[in-house]
């Protein structure tokens, strides 16, 4: 049974994450960027010269890992579904940086017996 108090009060601490240009390029390559070597729109994400980070890379930086597997949550992690994700950027993500992430559970809604719950987790990234 889900332990709502343990989930809602989960302390992730501050997560410091350093990534380099190589990481930025590998992320983009993993998305299929650069498959067409003549597509200049994609080359900016995989080539060192004037390298840019794919904006969605922010969704994987500063992750607290798979914390739902912690028995203290009471969650049946095998049945978890990632339902949706939202991203707000206030400036471009640097191609290389050290960031600090703060993760927090901002809401949890019980859908009823045997139907699970919806949890909203927020992650804020800032320059260190």
Regions found by a protein language model. Name each.
Residues 1-82:
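Hot-dog-fold acyl-thioester-processing enzymes
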Residues 1-9, 63, 80-128:
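HotDog/MaoC-like acyl-thioester-processing domains
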């Amino acid at each position: 049974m889900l332990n709502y108090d343990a989930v809602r009060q989960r302390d992730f601490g501050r997560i410091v994450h350093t990534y380099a240009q190589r990481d930025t390029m590998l992320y983009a390559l993993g998305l299929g960027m650069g498959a067409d070597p003549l597509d200049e729109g994609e080359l900016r994400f995989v080539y060192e010269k004037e390298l840019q980070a794919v904006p969605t890379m922010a969704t994987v930086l500063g992750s607290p890992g798979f914390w739902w597997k912690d028995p203290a949550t009471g969650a049946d992690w095998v049945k978890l579904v990632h339902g949706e994700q939202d991203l707000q950027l206030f400036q471009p993500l640097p191609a290389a940086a050290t960031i600090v992430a703060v993760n927090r559970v901002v809401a949890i809604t019980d859908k009823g017996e045997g139907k699970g719950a919806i949890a909203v987790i927020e992650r804020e990234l800032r320059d260190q």
